[in-house]
């Protein structure tokens, strides 16, 4: 056979699939006709402090806000620890989410359940929707092309024999992968594919949709000379949950799970960290557009679209909505520690975010030292006393998280404040940032 063995030490990503569930005024901005909101709404958690009229803060070269990668699985770091690898360069073993990327979809059936569905009908559950999602999110910089094996390949054992479930035992998962590749290898040419989806017959007994996930191999498996470090195992229903394969594809390109999985037996909510914001939190979210931080990490933001604020004083920015396809500043970053930043971006209602509950300026904390599924990103609740879109949001308390005109947020301890001062005719959001010290510190984080 033309493959190396499947090592028993493979590990899964957490898998994004689960059952559907639903102040004192600063000096006026010294730029053109930008309307300032009358007064600012200071949030309850803010420590009030008066903004001075000291030196204007300035945007440093973005290198000052790049977080180093850590040993955390799917680290949110953008560069290697030595700072030698630029944003958009994939870590070792990961493909780059840029340009034309080829994906292969292999369909697996089971001997006790002849499939009733045509493979192309199953493929249509996921494509072209998955490719369209990532093309829109990247502004056309990432183009995913699907190639399918247009027939079912029969596994040697029933699906029930593999005990497929979300918390799949390693031995059962390894047996499934070994059998799948043994069946596929003589029939499929794996050369040239960066992404491989192994899709099980959704109607076969023993196929559990909650088990869909990316499996990271302890050692790459080489198929037709193509080393693959991870495989996407798909066990979805027909039709599937929306955006589920787009979420799993994000893992292939080193994006982490942003939900916070409760301990076994707990009934706590999964979506308390980011709510509807970003596909990697929930594929059911109302605003699944990837965070601008993720777009920077994947190399989709052009030079000049990221601003890094470090020095003390006051500075002003116009933020173009994250989901908009054009140019403009998409990401504002305040360094808060060796492994953490406060990220600021605008969110509108268009593209992948057409169903967003609220628009405005969204703030979130990013930690490069947090594991996937352990809170690497936390959205700042801009309205902690309220919630929104209760009937459709995955986590209503964060559905209205963005700040509106006249509202502000200050880091605990008052090291920095972000204020939304206006909305421009072109849809951009005007933001004022004031820092008291060089490099904001987020109290309780990296202290």
Predicted regions and their residues:
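Non-catalytic C-terminal accessory/binding modules of secreted extracellular proteins
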Residues: 2-7, 46-50, 66-71, 218-220, ...
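Zn2+-dependent metallopeptidase catalytic core
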Residues: 54-237, 246, 264, 419
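Terminal targeting segments of Actinobacterial cell-envelope proteins
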Residues: 1-33, 444
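Extracellular hydrolytic enzyme modules, especially secreted metalloproteases
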Residues: 190, 195, 203-353
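Intrinsically disordered, low-complexity acidic/polar segments
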Residues: 114-115, 207, 289, 353, ...
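Non-catalytic surface loops within mature trypsin-like serine protease
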Residues: 109-112, 202, 284, 348, ...
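Secretory targeting and sorting signals
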Residues: 29-59
